[in-house]
Amino acid sequence: MDAAITTLGPRARGGLHRFANPGRFLRLAAAVQPWLTVPAILITLAGLYWGLFVSPADWQQGDAVRIMYIHVPSAWLASLGYFLLACCSFASIVWRHPLADMAAVEIGPVGAGFTGLCLATGSLWGKPMWGAWWVWDARLTSVLILFFLYLGHIALVRAFDDPQRGYRAGAILALVGVVNLPIIKYSVDWWNTLHQPATITLTGAPTMALDMLWPLLVCTIGFMLTFAAIVVARTRAAVMERRIRGLLLARSEAAE
């Protein structure tokens, strides 16, 4: 890692070294964990109650539309999680960042969980709307590929006796899989799919009624905080486990 970092400027090197310090990360994670976990629980519960029990039914879909309050945030977090996984993989390859390796390993299962939730709720939503649990359209297929990319990353980083080889192989797979993200995003525009175009965009006003939009946004914030809280907790545990193993190994070598 040091050899790669020396190619950067002094200020960048100092910033990377500070962030890569396990003790500093553990202190930061311990400080932010309660501020992530408690709001995540409260906001998610509030959003789900608002969406599932208070918001109105859709005039076409009826109460089936309430699946949206779980499905849509899960779909957004599935793609966002993979983008973060790719960013950590890039940092791992370019700067040999140890925390990037551990964060990527811990993001994988969380992202896979949200992707699986997206697929499951989408299937439940699709049955009453389309008359089938599954349809091989572009959006569904690309999200399924995303799920397999997550599973492939999880398997690949654990497939080698040398952890560094596993980290490198997983990072390469993650970066190659980034090409799937724009396919997921724009599949409804590029191909004729059963999914409707995006109702919330950065360039225009949302086409969704406000009494449905607000609980959806609250659920999304809650899901994002939940994702962050789980990843921080898992990465913190991974760093602590590595430090404990290092201490035990040092004691064993000293005893010999």
What are the functions of these language-model segments?
Residues 2-256:
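Polytopic transmembrane helical bundles with strong interfacial aromatic enrichment
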